[in-house]
């Protein structure tokens, strides 16, 4: 089991990372409202020991890095008089998804949360997310589902395996440009969503996310409108936690995919420009999208510095980003 050296981040909000005056709270009231829909966050009455056993009984696992975290669906059980609201495990269809610490890789929840916040900082829409303390003090990652409304009504959300008739075990097959063409086919705002898609692919490469496979992109049904690219989810810097990872992305940008164990590497500015223009984005717009992310570096570093990562991981993450941003300069 990984022994975590927790960062001393007392009096910091687990949603926005900023200071909290009240030492008894983990969130600002306005931050709790954004994530949980209530001004006081619910309690999570589980720890790693008992939640791992529950996860084995209930939820999926996969061979990907993201999959080493058990994922549990939760709902808020409203407390009675003088009792706190609690998050309880409900099986597959809860309104929240929880990812506790991994026994193999340290700081996965903290890495996923800071990466999601970095995506938001550069204009990428993300699902509502944050960190939450378990009853033993460990941090877990929590996100609110976007495929249902406040009443529990469910909306259709189809991932790229479903939209391209791929089996789940084939989620790494193909190329990103094929997914862009699928978006054009089904989205009500095809070129806007293609642009958003390539921004997310580019961000994933910059941040060392080599696990953005077909199931990590979805189209979400918006009532009275139609399908649009969903907010981003499952953003994790895989290369930060797995030093033996040989791929820079989950799939190539162009072509029909790769065979065998051929590494997916050697991306640079021209690689992304070519992929975007072949998808119908003009050269000028593609170049601006790249510059936009290059200019986010200082924002990203400020978020990393205020995060719950260890000092060592903070420096490693910034170094990884700098290395990739250098390859994007004209």
Which residues does each predicted region cover?
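Anionic ligand-binding catalytic core segments
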Residues: 1-214, 218-330
């Amino acid at each position: 089991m990984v022994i975590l050296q927790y960062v001393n981040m007392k009096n910091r909000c687990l949603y926005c990372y900023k200071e909290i005056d009240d030492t008894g709270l983990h969130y600002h009231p306005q931050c709790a409202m954004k994530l949980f829909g209530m001004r006081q966050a619910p309690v999570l009455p589980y720890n790693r020991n008992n939640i791992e056993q529950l996860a084995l009984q209930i939820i999926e696992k996969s061979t990907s890095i993201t999959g080493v975290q058990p994922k549990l669906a939760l709902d808020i059980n409203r407390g009675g008089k003088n009792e706190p609201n609690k998050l309880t495990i409900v099986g597959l269809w809860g309104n929240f998804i929880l990812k506790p610490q991994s026994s193999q890789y340290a700081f996965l929840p903290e890495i996923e949360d800071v990466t999601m916040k970095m995506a938001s900082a550069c204009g990428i829409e993300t699902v509502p997310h944050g960190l939450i303390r378990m009853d033993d003090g460990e941090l877990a990652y929590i996100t609110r589902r976007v495929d249902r409304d406040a009443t529990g009504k469910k909306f259709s959300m189809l991932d790229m395996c479903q939209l391209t008739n791929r089996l789940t075990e084939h989620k790494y097959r193909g190329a990103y440009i094929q997914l862009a063409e699928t978006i054009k086919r089904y989205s009500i705002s095809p070129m806007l969503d293609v642009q958003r898609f390539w921004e997310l692919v580019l961000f994933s490469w910059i941040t060392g996310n080599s696990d953005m496979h077909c199931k990590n992109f979805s189209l979400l049904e918006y009532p009275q409108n139609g399908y649009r690219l969903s907010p981003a989810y499952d953003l994790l810097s895989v290369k930060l936690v797995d030093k033996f990872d040989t791929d820079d992305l989950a799939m190539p940008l162009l072509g029909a995919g790769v065979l065998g164990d051929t590494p997916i590497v050697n991306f640079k500015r021209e690689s992304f420009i070519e992929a975007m223009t072949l998808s119908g984005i003009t050269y000028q717009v593609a170049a601006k999208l790249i510059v936009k992310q290059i200019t986010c570096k200082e924002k990203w570093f400020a978020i990393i510095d205020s995060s719950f990562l260890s000092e060592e991981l903070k420096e490693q993450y910034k170094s990884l980003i700098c290395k990739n941003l250098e390859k994007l300069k004209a």
